[in-house]
A protein has these predicted regions:
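Structural signal for hydrophobic packing residues in well-ordered secondary-structure cores
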Residues: 27-34, 44, 48-51, 70-73, ...
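Short coil/turn connectors at secondary-structure junctions
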Residues: 2-7, 35-38, 71-74, 104-108, ...
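Accessory alpha-helical/coil subdomains and C-terminal extensions
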Residues: 100, 111-113, 121-123, 127-134, ...
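Glycine-rich oxoanion-binding loops at beta->alpha junctions
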Residues: 53-107, 116-117, 144, 155-156, ...
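Short glycine-rich or small-residue beta-strand-to-loop segments that form or flank ligand, phosphate
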Residues: 6-16, 76-81, 107-113, 185-190
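Short, ordered loop/turn segments at secondary-structure junctions
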Residues: 12-14, 43-48, 81-82, 114-115, ...
Length: 225
């Protein structure tokens, strides 16, 4: 019989309204498969928690506490903006991760984040196998930008899309009420980097006679138009 292994879960990058719901899903599902997965450790402040061996034993939390994560905003275990360098630039960081995983009998690595987190999962999987301690590295998608490949609607995007749609609607009402003597243009800058999904959400507002101009990063801006 294969040895039962523990799991490690970490949150990465900017938190969203639903990242804790993903954490809840990982922990609750692991608890349903106690024959295969032992404890679920969470990294305090993301992947840094693994590098510093600062782990939270979620098995000490009640079922009610874990279930409450579904409706808890922000990042319950702490997140970080810490990008692991490439294997060539700093192999030691990856080796340190695997050392900690080995010390705590961790065979499953759940990394909740964006594209960089997916890349980290791939590298950890490759190196751990080369080191003779193969780890199942699973990327749990999370990004408000909605820019992950082969992902139609990423967890986190729906919440921010609603927020931007409501904010655009409220701003347009402000402009309409003040346009006679004051503000005639209201500029809203949103996140998204090279993807225009969040910007596009501003177009979800109802047609109330106020023009909404949306500029997408995918389309070159022509000032003459």
């Amino acid at each position: 019989m294969a040895k039962k292994m523990n799991a490690f879960y970490a949150q990465s990058g900017g938190v969203t309204a639903v990242i804790n719901a993903s954490a809840c899903g990982v922990i609750e599902t692991a608890r349903k498969h106690k024959d295969k997965i032992g404890k679920v450790y969470a990294g305090r402040n993301g992947i840094i928690g693994a590098l510093t061996e600062d782990l939270i034993d979620t098995s000490k939390e009640s079922a009610a506490a874990i279930a409450a994560l579904r409706s808890t905003p922000s990042g319950a275990f702490g997140s970080c903006r810490f990008k692991l360098k490439s294997l060539e630039a700093n192999k030691r960081e990856y080796e340190r991760l695997i050392e900690v995983f080995k010390a705590h009998n961790i065979g499953y690595f759940f990394y909740n984040g964006g594209g960089d987190s997916a890349d980290t999962c791939f590298k950890v999987s490759q190196l751990s196998e080369a080191m003779g301690y193969p780890i199942q590295a699973i990327h749990v998608p999370k990004t408000v930008d909605n820019d992950l490949p082969i992902t139609d609607c990423c967890p986190g995007f729906g919440s921010v899309a609603k927020y931007i749609a409501v904010s655009t609607l409220e701003a347009s009402y402000d402009v309409r009420s003040m346009a006679k003597t004051s503000t005639k243009v209201f500029v809203i800058e949103v996140m998204g980097r090279h993807a225009g999904w969040i910007a596009a959400a501003g177009g979800l507002v109802e047609d109330h006679g106020i023009p909404v101009v949306i500029l997408f990063p995918e389309i070159e801006f022509d000032q003459k138009k």
